[in-house]
Amino acid sequence: MRRTFVRIAFVTDLNTTLVRDFERKYREAAQTIRALVEPLTDEQIWTRPYPYGNTIGHLLLHLTGNLSYYIAGEIGGSGYVRNRPLEFTDTSRAPKAVLLKMFGGTIEMVIAVIKKQSEQDWSAAYTAKGFEDCGDRFTAFLRCAAHLSHHTGQIIYLCKELELQSRE
């Protein structure tokens, strides 16, 4: 009996830790992106660093689509329908304020889904197009956090390049 109690207490603590740490990771990345992108002009966020490179605007569309589909849609049940190719080819050049609002709203949706996870939910089966080998929700949240970190790094680089170009 005591062993079961200790195990349940540990799992509850683990659940609290997972929720807290995932929320922190997603918020930190979003805050970094916002702080870097806010000083830029609309023209700058749609500037290609080289002919085949992604713009900051396209990366924001991509991150919004990725998180909206894999977490808000597949786990949260939002019904989001993704058009991944458009994330990289959209020519509408939405204003920076619109992109940041969409991205920020998506981060808030992701955090709301994270906070709803119970101890059992983390190990619930997860499959989605592109994540067929994922296995469980924990791995889906982890992959999406890693993906967000990867593209946050790209945005950091692009912002530094734009800053250097503006000094020349």
Residue ranges and their predicted role:
Residues 10-14:
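N-terminal intrinsically disordered/low-complexity leader segments
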Residues 31, 42-45, 68, 108, ...:
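Generic structural signal for secondary-structure transition and capping sites
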Residues 91-125, 136-147:
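Acidic/histidine-rich alpha-helical segments that form the ligand environment
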Residues 5-8, 19, 23-27, 34, ...:
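Short, contiguous alpha-helical
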Residues 16-23, 93-97:
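Active-site rim elements
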Residues 26, 30, 37, 103, ...:
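Hydrophobic alpha-helical core bundles mediating ligand binding, dimerization, or RNAP-core interactions
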